[in-house]
Amino acid sequence: VEPELIAWRRHFHEFPELSNREVNTGKYIADFLKTLPNLEVRYPVAKTGVVAVLKGGKPGAVIALRADIDALPVYERVAIPFASKVTTEFNGQKVSVMHACGHDSHTAMLMATAKMLSAMQKEVPGTIVFLFQPAEEGAPENEEGGAQLMIKEGALDNPKVEAVFGIHISSQTPVGNIKYKSGAFMASSDWFTIKVNGKGSHGSQPWGGV
């Protein structure tokens, strides 16, 4: 499956889409998953996301594997054949779009996982739910999206998911290895606002200002 995984990753890298705008990305994923045996595919979920369920041949828990599928408004400065060719409107401006956070890899990795596990369905214990989440970078202003909207639309229900593993690459992990732990594993960011009431001062006495 490695050649396919590389090809998928390069495809997504070349044609990235911003949060809640992953129309072609979601369709590409869903169309592929529908070709696999033993998978129940739901699309669209949370506008552009995809959910696929694999019921294993042995008893066990219901777990979910999740990958994010959106890109960022970033210009790619790398001369590679599959560099991003996409520009779009973002906050009223024309911007370039790039998979600068690895979501192209995460998506390809989860597609490859779905292919392998669906082929060995009889040996899989429990049920696997594959979650391809849009808008991980944050839904546009005044729009719903991301994990909250997927949950709201029942992505973790029917079957009821007992645990979720987020798929993420790491340049510090040797090829052929995986890392996992209970609870949080990698950092994320929170948004907050600081209001500062300034006080002017002379340039020769900056310590007097705020």
Residue spans for each PLM region:
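Acidic/His- and Gly-rich active-site-bordering loop/insert found
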Residues: 1-99, 108-125
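Histidine/acidic-residue-rich, glycine-tolerant segments that coordinate divalent metal ions
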Residues: 86-98, 104-105, 122-210
